[in-house]
Amino acid sequence: MHKPSLLTFGAAAAVLVLAGCGQKTPAPAASAPASAVAAGEAVSVPFAVAGPTSGGIAHIGKDVENGVRMALDEINATKPVIGGKAVTFKIVAEDDAGDPKQATAIAQKLCDSKAVAVVGHLQSGTSIPASRIYHDCGIPQITPSATNPDLTKSGYKNVFRLIANDNQLGAAVAEFAAKKEGVKTVAIVDDRTAFGQGLAAVFKQVAEKNGLQVVAHEFTSDKAVDFMPILTSIKTKKPDAILFGGLDSQAGPMLRQMQQLG
């Protein structure tokens, strides 16, 4: 039997910053002279980024935070003027540690601090509960990587997603597996998070529609480091491929343990 391949999909960080702030005011009849604008002190505008900068996926959270910092530096370098006033965007960075309770506490804190927008949160499990709070206080929420469809099913007009959702991602991975030569049977492992479960459910449905046989569906947690018991059980089913619904911080160790098992 050939070794099964590991099909993974982890959160990829991408940041798009759309800057806008201030109350709506009538447009002036003529642009203010540059000297007049420059003479006034720039208004400091808080722009937030929230995600896990500690814990197992801190590397992703830090990448997103650095992306926001770079974007705001570029915007500030242009000496932006909004409503005739010079403004400077000030980053407000918050660490939710990938924890839903911390995410909701941060969301309320950002509402109280009058942040004009937030890039975050990174995971579906943190983005969904936080979105309700951002909606209530009117802060635009831009998530770079939360994929669970429930995030946007609420219909909140202030919530934006910069990545395809699980329905699209799970289907794409399943269709890829079905077209891959030699893949007839698959096993699934998911981390029981909103992301992992959602991706795995769609993958299973579409995989079976495309003629693949799902021979096992195992569960782990997003904190696990030892996958040997799960992989040993899966090995007896002899799948051609394994779908892991989780993040790269666990996919790497899982792949190494697969190789150890042969």
What are the residue ranges of the model-derived segments?
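Alpha-helical structural signal in soluble globular domains
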Residues: 67, 71, 78, 129-137, ...
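Bacterial signal peptide processing site
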Residues: 21-24
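Signal peptide-proximal N-terminal region
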Residues: 36-42, 66-91, 208-211
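Extracytoplasmic "Venus flytrap"
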Residues: 37-69, 94-100, 123, 189-197
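Extracellular/periplasmic Venus flytrap/periplasmic-binding protein
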Residues: 105, 148-150, 157-262
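Bacterial N-terminal signal peptides that target proteins for export
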Residues: 1-10
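Beta-alpha junction/loop-to-helix N-cap segments that form part of ligand/metal-binding clefts
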Residues: 60-63, 80-153, 162, 220-227, ...
